[in-house]
Amino acid sequence: MSQISAKDVKELRDTTGVGMMECKKALEETGGDMQKAVEYLRKKGAAMAAKRADREASEGVVCILMSDDQKTGVILELNCETDFVARGEVFTGFANELATLALSNNCESREDLLGIKLGEAYGNETVEEALKSMTGKVGEKLELKRMARLTAEAGVLESYIHPGSQLGALIAIDTDKPAEAKALAKDLAMQVAAAAPIEVSRDAVSTELVEKEKEIYRQQALAEGKKEEFVDKIVMGRLNKYYQEVVLTEQTFIKDQNTKVSGVLDDFMKKNQAQVKVKAFVRYQLGA
C-alpha cells in the first residue's frame, strides 16, 4: 500500500469537505488515487443516505434570495436531523448555494432544482446527487423539502426572514410606484410571516375548503343546541371570522390593531396617488 501523505489528505478534504480521518481512509482504500478516493466518498455518502432514508429530517433552515434588481426571488426549505447541523456553516452554505442555483437557473419548483448541476465545489453533481453526498459529509439525512419562485415585473418584491431562519416570507406586489411601495412590501412580508394567511383575498380560498369549514361550523352550532332556523346565520358569521384569520387583506395589520391590511393598501393608494395590489406570497415555516 502506498504511503498516504498529509498533503493528499488535505487536498481531498478541500475537494470534498469530508473529515480528515474519512479522507485518509478513502485514500488508503483506493491506493492513493485521488479521483477514486473522491468517488469512494461519494458512494459512501449515497450509502449513508440510503441507510438514513427513514430518519426524520425536521430541523433545518428557510432560505430566501432575490435578484439584484429585486424583481425575482426564490424561497426554499432545506432539512436535516438536528439543530446542531442546521446551525453549521457547511449546512447553511449548502442552503445558500441551492438558493443561488435556483435563482440563476429560473427554477420554478423543487423538482426543477433537483436536476440542476452544482459547481466544482460540490463535484459538479446534480442537487439530487449532492444531497446524498452531503449526507455522508454531515452524517445526517438531508432533504430539500420545497422551493418556490416569485416575480414582480410590474412592481416590487420583498422578503422577511425571522431570526433563526426557521420562518420566512416572500411577497410580490404590483404597483406603479415601486420605490414608494418598498416599505409597504416589507411590512406585508412581515405580516405574512407573523399572521400566516393562506390566500390574498377570500375569492382565492378554494370552494372545497370553504364548504369544509361551513360544515364544521354547522355541526358545531347544532351540537351547541342552536335552533335550525338560526344555524345558517351562525355559520356565515363564523365563516367571516375565518376569512379574517386566513385572508391577507382581511387580517388585522400587525403594526396597527385598529386597521385591516386592506385599509393599509387603501391608505397607500390615496397618499401616493398610486395603484397597488398584492400579486402573490409564499410563506415557509420549518416543519409546517
Curated annotation (Swiss-Prot):
Record's keyword annotation contains Cytoplasm: yes
Subcellular location: Cytoplasm
Involved in Mg(2+) ion dislocation from EF-Tu: annotated span: 82-85
UniProt cross-references to InterPro entries, sorted A to Z: EF-Ts_dimer_sf, Transl_elong_EFTs/EF1B, Transl_elong_EFTs/EF1B_dimer, Transl_elong_Ts_CS, UBA-like_sf
Any one Gene Ontology cellular component term annotated for this protein: cytoplasm
Swiss-Prot/TrEMBL keywords: Cytoplasm, Elongation factor, Protein biosynthesis
A Pfam family of this chain: EF_TS
Keyword Transmembrane recorded: no
Gene3D superfamilies assigned: 1.10.286.20, DNA helicase RuvA subunit, C-terminal domain (1.10.8.10), Elongation factor Ts, dimerisation domain (3.30.479.20)
Function comment: Associates with the EF-Tu.GDP complex and induces the exchange of GDP to GTP. It remains bound to the aminoacyl-tRNA.EF-Tu.GTP complex up to the GTP hydrolysis stage on the ribosome.
NCBIfam families: tsf
HAMAP family, alphabetized: EF_Ts
Protein name, entry field: Elongation factor Ts
Source lineage: Bacteria, Pseudomonadati, Chlorobiota, Chlorobiia, Chlorobiales
Gene name per UniProt: tsf
